[in-house]
């Protein structure tokens, strides 16, 4: 009798609780961020890593007259994300956002985009506020990274773009690469 009760109890538990071992738990689909980053004609999804090559500018025959920068001539651009669900492809009202840059080697960076003034980064994390609208559908990031001539290295910065109405930002890793030719 106890074996029958145990079997019935086991069957009841299986039916009542369900067997979820093989079934994935459904998660609500997260909407695509309203903002994205475009670089050299390609729009990148949140989570992407973007490589930005450094360019040597020679002002003479000597390395003493050389400047090496990345991000000054060819800069990523903040754009309205074409993948954003529930949004039209054009901006009918202004889209305000926050751009946050984090860089451990912050002294190498000069930030000239999003807001009108150029300023060197003075701390590990810097924040700027911008706006996209029907009349201004993109905004150059203009985050420049300087290198010492012939000191080949890669410097990384993280960019968070978050529209005012969003809970989660779009996140990008920007790798500024000064490679030996």
What are these regions (language model features)?
Residues 2-8:
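Sec-dependent signal peptide recognition
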Residues 27-88:
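Beta-sheet-dominated interaction scaffolds and their linkers
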Residues 170-180:
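C-terminal edge beta-strand
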Residues 153-165:
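A short beta-strand micro-motif common to beta-rich folds, especially ectodomain repeats
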Residues 15-16:
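C-terminal motif of bacterial Sec signal peptides marking the signal peptidase cleavage site
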Residues 82-92, 150, 164:
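Short solvent-exposed strand-capping/beta-turn motif centered on an Asx-Ser/Thr pair
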Residues 137-150:
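Short, hydrophobic beta-strand segments
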Residues 87-137:
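Surface-exposed binding patches on compact interaction domains or structured appendages
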């Amino acid at each position: 009798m106890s074996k029958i009760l145990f079997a019935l109890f086991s069957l009841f538990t299986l039916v009542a609780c369900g067997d979820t071992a093989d079934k994935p738990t459904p998660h609500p689909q997260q909407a695509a961020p309203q903002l994205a980053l475009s670089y050299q004609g390609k729009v990148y999804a949140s989570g992407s890593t973007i490589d930005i090559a450094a360019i040597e500018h020679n002002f003479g025959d000597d390395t003493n007259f050389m400047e090496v920068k990345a991000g000054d001539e060819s800069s990523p651009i903040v754009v309205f994300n074409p993948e954003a669900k529930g949004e039209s492809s054009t901006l009918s009202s202004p889209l305000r956002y926050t751009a946050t840059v984090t860089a451990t080697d912050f002294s190498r960076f000069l930030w000239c985009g999003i807001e009108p003034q150029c300023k060197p980064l003075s701390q590990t994390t810097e924040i700027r506020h911008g706006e996209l609208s029907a009349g201004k559908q993109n905004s150059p990031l203009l985050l420049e990274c300087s290198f010492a001539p012939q000191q080949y290295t890669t410097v990384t910065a993280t960019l968070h773009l978050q529209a005012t109405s969003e809970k989660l930002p779009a996140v990008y890793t920007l790798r500024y690469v000064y490679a030996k030719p």
